[in-house]
């Protein structure tokens, strides 16, 4: 096993992903001992079958990719995903409410979804490409105050993905109280290592095989 494998959420979230591609994703995750596969909810059940009796976790997305669903919808999505077999939930926060610094709304949404997660892991996607510096700091402080397990940079569908300076900023605010997932645009081993060194404990990427083979 590559020493970096355990950091990887092996990701396939494109809207036209096929069953064959999901099968291949799961095989790669098992062979390379990645931490999880990150897939759309419609594939949870089949991925659970492919990964039966392996340690690979199943991560899925909620409120994805815009975050504009109601909290009630996100709670339903979360419960449904876990019933299907998801181990981790990557939920897109309501971006408008976050940018408006609506602390009460953001906290309530995160905590309601975490309650629906029960003992499963909740990562909150804040879409850094749409935030200014003050909003990024606010996002980290909301996560620190909330019941979430992780803050996550990006959906991979915005104009930019993870930036090293954001991981450094969040690590300063969060310390070891919450974990950080860097995702979006991570394509080479040097960047992968830099994000880990800066404090990320999980990397979401669709390029994990190439990255860890240093291609």
UniProtKB/Swiss-Prot annotation:
Q: Report if keyword Lyase is assigned.
A: yes
Please name the GO terms of the biological process aspect recorded for this protein, alphabetically: 2-deoxyribose 1-phosphate catabolic process; carbohydrate catabolic process; deoxyribonucleotide catabolic process
Which protein family is it in? Belongs to the DeoC/FbaB aldolase family. DeoC type 1 subfamily.
Q: Which GO terms describe its molecular function?
A: deoxyribose-phosphate aldolase activity
Q: Which Pfam families match?
A: DeoC
Q: What is this protein called?
A: Deoxyribose-phosphate aldolase
Biological pathway: Carbohydrate degradation; 2-deoxy-D-ribose 1-phosphate degradation; D-glyceraldehyde 3-phosphate and acetaldehyde from 2-deoxy-alpha-D-ribose 1-phosphate: step 2/2
Catalyzed reaction equations: 2-deoxy-D-ribose 5-phosphate = D-glyceraldehyde 3-phosphate + acetaldehyde
Primary subcellular site in the record, as a coarse category: cytoplasm
Native organism: Ureaplasma urealyticum serovar 10 (strain ATCC 33699 / Western)
Q: What is its EC number?
A: 4.1.2.4
Query: Which enzyme type, at the first EC level?
Result: lyase
On the tree of life, the source organism's domain of life is: Bacteria
* Primary role: Catalyzes a reversible aldol reaction between acetaldehyde and D-glyceraldehyde 3-phosphate to generate 2-deoxy-D-ribose 5-phosphate.
Q: Which InterPro entries match?
A: Aldolase_TIM, DeoC, DeoC/FbaB/LacD_aldolase, DeoC_typeI
- Where is this protein found? Cytoplasm
Query: Which residues participate directly in catalysis?
Result: 90, 152, 181
One Gene Ontology term, aspect cellular component: cytoplasm
Keyword set, alphabetical order: Cytoplasm, Lyase, Schiff base
